[in-house]
Amino acid sequence: MFPFDRKDSAAMVLDREKQLYSSRSVADKFAILETIRLELDRLYREDRPRYDELEKALRPATRQALEDSWKLWNPVPKSHVDWVGPGEMTCRLRPTHPDFAECAACNFTQCTYDEHGSPDFSKVTFPGSVVDISDLYDRLSVENIQKRGGSAASLQELAQMRMVPELQPVIKKWARETGNPEDFWEWRNALNLVPHEDTDCRTMRLVYRPVHVVFKHRGGVANAINIKNHFGA
């Protein structure tokens, strides 16, 4: 992200805003929008008159994209959890949570989120599954970005196919030991893994399904669609 000089944050925000309407990647535009959002968050807390003035100076599409970004922060766990740690950014499941046992079986009953709403799934990421998909966000339509499986044109399917070369030895070993076909999709489902599009619109990884379901989050697909809807790609 781009650091702001607080003495001239309004000028910096408006300069960053211009970059949203230039020829840049979805991932870069997401990073720029986040820089603006975080600075506006700070001004809202510390200097409301300056915030109000700056918010009015932004273009309508920028304001709507920011509004959508703030809404995307909302789907985080709220029931049977405690928010702990610095800034209360770590979500810890209580034993009363209905999915506590499943997450405990994955050795993952708490998750830390960053200021962008991104969950740290590094401990439950299957080794070798992380792939760069930033180009897919740029070239695919919104329809194919949000499509969930069942189509070779969808982001989810194209992205997961990029994992196969790195994971092939693991899949071969699993097929040999279980007598199952040497198939990525069967292997993935047998291990209860699901794709997770990282918040930054740059990468995808495989994580364990219970964790992905329980620790709700702001994902790359929603962020990319927000960017494409308001600023193109």
Per-segment meaning from a language model:
Residues F2-V194, D198-A233:
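Nuclease and nuclease-like effector domains acting on nucleic acids or nucleotide cofactors
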